[in-house]
Structure formats: structure tokens, C-alpha cells
Amino acid sequence: MKNIKVIYLESETCGLCHALQPRVEEVTEQEGIALEVINVTQHPEVASQYQVLTVPVAIVFVGEREFARQARFIDMELFEKQLQQAKEFAQMEDYPS
């Protein structure tokens, strides 16, 4: 199975970011998916790299490709479905990395 990871971009001044982060951590841990949390205030170059204009943002990657993205108001039910779909796609032999 190809690598699946989630990049969660947040800001220290974002209350919603801090409220959602524990739930994002819980779900990714349950699914066995790597999570990287990045503070865009401290690392604005990362926000630019991923074209992030608002936070929070959760980006799901399968291999090196972006598979799904949610920004601002993250629907946790949809996020869980996106992780399941990413796992299914990662198991497909013909899915490009």
C-alpha cells in the first residue's frame, strides 16, 4: 500500500483550528494514517506551497498526490470517509503515486 498522510495546517490564533485538531489526531490515529501538523504563522512558505488562504486545512495525500482537501469548516464525517477512500485507492495497483 502506498503512503497515505494528512497535513493539517493551523494557526496559533485560530480557535477553530485548536478545537478540531484533537479530533483530526484521533481519527488519523484510528485509521493508522500519518499526520503532520504545521503552523502557518511559523511556516508561511508551507501555506504558500499548498495554496492555503484560510485555516484550518486538512489535506489527504496518497503517495505524493493530493487526494482530498477540506478547509475552514472541516466536516469530520466526510473527513473519515475521505480517509477510507484514500486507503482503498492506495491499495489499487494502478493508482499513480
Where are these regions (language model features)?
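Local sequence-structure signature of Cys/Sec-based thiol-disulfide redox active-site neighborhoods
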Residues: 1-26, 30
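Thiol-based oxidoreductase modules, predominantly thioredoxin-like and allied folds used
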Residues: 9, 32-46
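Conserved strand-loop elements at the edges of beta-sheets that form or border functional pockets
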Residues: 40, 52, 72
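CheY-like receiver
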Residues: 46-50, 82
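Structural micro-motif
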Residues: 50-59
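Non-catalytic, surface beta->alpha helical segment in thiol-disulfide oxidoreductase systems
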Residues: 61-94
